[in-house]
Amino acid sequence: MELIFLGTSAGVPTRTRNVTAILLNLQHPTQSGLWLFDCGEGTQHQLLHTAFNPGKLDKIFISHLHGDHLFGLPGLLCSRSMSGIVQPLTIYGPQGIREFVETALRISGSWTDYPLEIVEIGAGEIFDDGLRKVTAYPLEHPLECYGYRIEEHDKPGALNAQALKAAGVPPGPLFQELKAGKTIMLDDGRQINGADYLAAPVPGKALAIFGDTGPCDAALELAKGVDVMVHEATLDMAMEAKANSRGHSSTRQAAALAREAGVGKLIITHVSSRYDDKGCQHLLRECRSIFPATELANDFAVFNV
């Protein structure tokens, strides 16, 4: 999986940072996909500066209905239609997301020429497509807000082709059945169990993408053991009380959560517009003093999961 940050500013855009939007490129060899997490104003314009086509989007996840995470959605939906895109799109979000989208389209006399499904979610598993599952966790914010945990299922281990050939199994379709863990019967009556020729499963990757939040009970469960955790660091340590009063987190709180959850990497985003480049480096240093494996997301930054 690959993360591409389209917007990393909190509340309002700056000259160097747009408001929140994150692409997730699934990069699966047989079932690829492009997902978008939040869609602040100007997201479709940010997309133009990447190699990704809006027509490839198949799922959009909205954390909450504050404008800096949402106001780019109607324009993106309409542009997909104007471009002749017919690929279906599913939007997941909290209660009210359906009304927002339908009202914006109706009042503006707009429509979509592709199948559009809107799913209003609650806490819990959203879907499992057999390759990965997505679970929503409630966060601490003035509006109903969710973080999303994306978990790949473990992949089958490598098939020991040499051992199979030595056992008299001819390469070809039978190898595919054995790779799937099935048992086959050879012409001489022998049964070959694929599980006996498979290496240990390859653990799938796990990713946690937080919406806006102050400290909350569900945060640890959402982030526990993930390879990458994306979390806001709206304000620095000195302004922690102010951040919490508005349903946001400080650098210290983001880094402390990453350390407690045992994540592989922390990526901080949703930076207050009060911070220039020098100020952002200050935020990064504060996080790294607690959790060294921290990176600062800038617009168009790319991270592998």
Curated annotation (Swiss-Prot):
Please tell me where Zn(2+) 2 binds in this chain.
68-69, 212, 270
Q: What CDD domains does the entry give?
A: RNaseZ_ZiPD-like_MBL-fold (cd07717)
Q: Which Pfam families match?
A: Lactamase_B_2
**Keyword Transport attached:** no
CC cofactor note: Binds 2 Zn(2+) ions.
Residues annotated as the enzyme's active site: 68 (proton acceptor)
Give the E.C. number(s).
Answer: 3.1.-.-
Query: Which positions in this protein are listed as binding Zn(2+) 1?
Result: 64, 66, 141, 212
Instruction: Give this protein's Gene Ontology molecular function annotations.
Output: 3'-tRNA processing endoribonuclease activity; exonuclease activity; zinc ion binding
CC cofactor: Zn(2+)
UniProtKB keywords? Endonuclease, Exonuclease, Hydrolase, Metal-binding, Nuclease, tRNA processing, Zinc
Name the family.
Answer: Belongs to the RNase Z family. RNase BN subfamily.
Quaternary structure, from the entry: Homodimer.
| Protein's job | Zinc phosphodiesterase, which has both exoribonuclease and endoribonuclease activities.
The record ties this protein, via HAMAP family, to: RNase_Z_BN
Protein's name according to its UniProt entry: Ribonuclease BN
State the species of origin: Escherichia coli O6:K15:H31 (strain 536 / UPEC)
